Design a protein with these regions (language model features):
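Hydrophobic (often cysteine-bearing) scaffold residues that line and stabilize catalytic clefts
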Residues: 3
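Charged catalytic carboxylate motif
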Residues: 6
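SAM cofactor-binding core of SAM-dependent methyltransferases
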Residues: 9-118
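Receiver (REC) domain switch-region micro-motif
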Residues: 32, 128-130
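Conserved Walker B
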Residues: 37, 134-135
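Short catalytic-loop micro-motif centered on adjacent basic/acidic residues
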Residues: 78, 131-133
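Class I S-adenosyl-L-methionine
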Residues: 115, 119-128, 135-168
Length: 168
């Protein structure tokens, strides 16, 4: 997927930039939140080709690169999924401990209903990257995103499916 190539290169550049900006501080905290985690499109138990595996791999790699440059970085991932079957696969994968150097959690439910819990999880000190890639047509509008958009030290990558936008 093109979006995964974009996500990987963007996330790596962003995390390394934010991490290096914190050099000299006791610790850099970088959070990644996948608001529509899935997994989708992968039957592989390692979830290869999903944003889940990609984000964990990228954050683990960035943590190692930052450590080699003298930056102590805490990497955290949060995955939100409302589909019960997909959430079960996600939860099982995360419990296996792949990329253990990255802290990870998953919340079952719709990200809209969980916005305040997501913000509590993010805290106020760390930098947070939100990946918003809805499965199918989901009206992701400013009013829905407002609580997240108002959080300081945050960045967003929102995937819009052209065909859905073109139909409106």
């Amino acid at each position: 997927y093109i979006k995964h190539t974009l996500l990987e290169s963007y996330l790596e550049t962003l995390v390394l930039t934010v991490g290096m900006g914190a050099k000299g501080e006791a610790q850099a905290e970088i959070c990644y939140v996948d608001c529509f985690a899935g997994p989708w499109g992968s039957e592989d138990e390692n979830l290869d080709g999903t944003s889940i595996a990609l984000s964990l791999k990228t954050l683990a790699s960035c943590k190692a690169k930052l450590a080699s440059l003298g930056v102590n970085a805490r990497m955290r991932d949060l995955f939100i999924e409302k589909d019960k079957k997909a959430f079960g696969r996600l939860s099982t994968f995360l419990k296996r401990g792949t990329f253990a150097e990255v802290e990870r959690e998953c919340f079952p439910g719709d990200f809209v209903d969980l916005r305040h819990e997501i913000l509590r999880w993010c805290g106020t000190n760390g930098f947070t990257f939100f990946f918003i890639d809805p499965k199918g047509w989901t009206p992701v509008v400013i009013e829905v995103l407002r609580p997240l958009l108002q959080r300081r030290r945050s960045e967003f990558l929102i995937n819009f499916i052209y065909d859905f936008i073109n139909r409106t």
